[in-house]
Amino acid sequence: MDYKVEHIGIAVKDLATSIPLFEQLLGSPCYKTESVDSESVNTAFFLQQSTKIELLESSNPEGPIAKFIDKKGEGMHHIAFEVLDIVAEMERLKKLGFTLLNETPKKGADNKLICFVHPKETNGVLIELCQSI
């Protein structure tokens, strides 16, 4: 498959602190914030040429981002690749023996359907597949 990097996800403790920091660092404003209740996360997006940076703040102390930060600290959480047909790509990866963290695509931030590939099978990198809705 010819994947395009859609965004890079960065886990942060506090969006209120991190948004101004990244606006200064990147020289561009945050263009969108969104809460995704199904993932217990609040997000903020920045556009850098054709790639997005997504900041992820946990909205629940037991959520996956909170657990990630407790274990590894703030930092890069995942790389997301854009796919045209997420269901077909999930089937292709399952046939190749990859473990997916969800059996069906879920509604994610930024009007996307998403699925994650287990990082134990991708050299420790959490891979997200995403398809525009």
Please describe what each predicted stretch is.
Residues M1, K4-K13, A44-L47, A66-I133:
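Vicinal oxygen chelate
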Residues M1-E39, G63:
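Long, hydrophobic N-terminal alpha-helical segment
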Residues V5, F22, F46, I53-L56, ...:
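Short, structured motif recognition centered on aromatic/hydrophobic residues
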Residues S18-L21, E89-L93:
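Hydrophobic side chains in well-ordered alpha-helices
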Residues S28, E74, F98:
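Short glycine/serine/threonine/alanine-rich loop segments
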Residues S28-Q48, K52, H118:
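N-terminal strand-loop-strand beta-hairpin
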Residues V36, E54-S59, P64-K67, L100, ...:
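Intrinsic, low-complexity N-terminal interaction/targeting segments
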